[in-house]
Amino acid sequence: FFSTSCGTTCRNDDVWGGDKLSYLNDQLETYAETEAKLNSTPVMLDHGYFQIGDGRLSTEEVFRDFIDKKIYVNSIEKEEPMYRWSIDYSKEQMQSAVSQGLPQVAAGCLTFYDKEGNESDAITEFAGQEAEEILGTIKNIIITERGNSGIAQSMVIYGKQGAVKVDGQMAIRQVLYPFEVEIVKQDESRVSGWSLLPSAYFYIEKDKEGAYHLYGGGFGHGVG
């Protein structure tokens, strides 16, 4: 179902909606997890006991520690190049990325807001317009919701003229269109020219110069 995990799998309903399937759970992809499943015992991590699918990774602090390897997990795929990755965007590169990525996202995954925070009808006028015409200069990007496995499910892009809420892991990966930047794998190899992020298992930081730094893991949606 996916190329490389970030150390955890994802529930099917967190990616595609619909009814949850019992055999597609969010769980740690570790040797200890396999043993825990067999013996019905939890896996011990620095933040306490992680029961299978207990949702701890949905909290931002724990998810960041997980991606930064401050929580040690003996993952089955921990040596894979795409197990961890990072992307740096300058302020201008992020503006360009969103301008190119936003028109690719299905309208049903987007909710626009005006400067006062009221829902806007910009979506009806969006076709063919640059993101800067709708949002203005991008001021910040924040992930606002994660699934139990830590997968980003909602993200808000704040602009000088308004904001847009992006829902769904695929839409989030599309809107931050990384075509003009390099994806740096954990083995320090680099790839470029991608049309979407490797996965939605990432967090984002903005520095004082206005550049954005993404730190993530895995390649694919993670269901399986």
Predicted regions and their residues:
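Conserved, single-site charged/polar hotspot
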Residues: 1-224
